[in-house]
Amino acid sequence: MIRKLDDFDIKILDLLQHDATATMAELSEKTGLSANACWRRIRLLEADGVIKNRVTLLDPQKIGLGITVFVCIRCAEHSQDWLDNFLQIVNESPEVIEFYRLAGDIDYLLKLQVASISEYDRLYKKLVSRVKLTDVSAIFSMEELKHSTILPLPETSDKAERKA
């Protein structure tokens, strides 16, 4: 069972979401906890799966992957074997950076980051040759207006805010 997050956990998570490279000394100063207490809390949050990973976020434009494609997929097949095959192909494709099963008219949504339309087309051909799909529609992003990896966290009490 996962423990309930307290105000200090929330403050630490908020700080790390904004800067995962923050030192224990910086976290200590901003939370009012000792560096050792911050370290222990982070280890517990990692063990509980609250903190999944610490990564460096890259700018897709600056590494030559400036085209964002949302691929809407409809299918008639929904068996576990079919899904396992589909998942295998998606997992083999690093261009697919997000993958969702949906409720509604569209069954699956993929988000791709590619260098060119021809790169998207190569992935499209690979996908439709290996998985039975009813309809595949691509939506090409013209401009990213907002992108965030920061999740909204519950408000902390006044006590934690005064200490931070």
From Swiss-Prot:
<dbReference type="Pfam" id="PF13412">
    <property type="entry name" value="HTH_24"/>
</dbReference>
<dbReference type="InterPro" id="IPR019888">
    <property type="entry name" value="Tscrpt_reg_AsnC-like"/>
</dbReference>
<keyword id="KW-0804">Transcription</keyword>
<comment type="function">
    <text>Represses the secondary, H(+)-coupled glutamate uptake system (Gluemp) genes.</text>
</comment>
<dbReference type="InterPro" id="IPR019887">
    <property type="entry name" value="Tscrpt_reg_AsnC/Lrp_C"/>
</dbReference>
<dbReference type="InterPro" id="IPR011991">
    <property type="entry name" value="ArsR-like_HTH"/>
</dbReference>
<keyword id="KW-0805">Transcription regulation</keyword>
<feature type="domain" description="HTH asnC-type">
    <location>
        <begin position="5"/>
        <end position="66"/>
    </location>
</feature>
<dbReference type="InterPro" id="IPR000485">
    <property type="entry name" value="AsnC-type_HTH_dom"/>
</dbReference>
<dbReference type="InterPro" id="IPR036390">
    <property type="entry name" value="WH_DNA-bd_sf"/>
</dbReference>
<dbReference type="Pfam" id="PF01037">
    <property type="entry name" value="AsnC_trans_reg"/>
</dbReference>
<protein>
    <recommendedName>
        <fullName>Glutamate uptake regulatory protein</fullName>
    </recommendedName>
</protein>
<keyword id="KW-0678">Repressor</keyword>
<dbReference type="GO" id="GO:0043565">
    <property type="term" value="F:sequence-specific DNA binding"/>
</dbReference>
<dbReference type="InterPro" id="IPR036388">
    <property type="entry name" value="WH-like_DNA-bd_sf"/>
</dbReference>
<feature type="DNA-binding region" description="H-T-H motif">
    <location>
        <begin position="24"/>
        <end position="43"/>
    </location>
</feature>
<dbReference type="GO" id="GO:0043200">
    <property type="term" value="P:response to amino acid"/>
</dbReference>
<dbReference type="GO" id="GO:0005829">
    <property type="term" value="C:cytosol"/>
</dbReference>
<keyword id="KW-0238">DNA-binding</keyword>
<dbReference type="InterPro" id="IPR019885">
    <property type="entry name" value="Tscrpt_reg_HTH_AsnC-type_CS"/>
</dbReference>
<dbReference type="InterPro" id="IPR011008">
    <property type="entry name" value="Dimeric_a/b-barrel"/>
</dbReference>
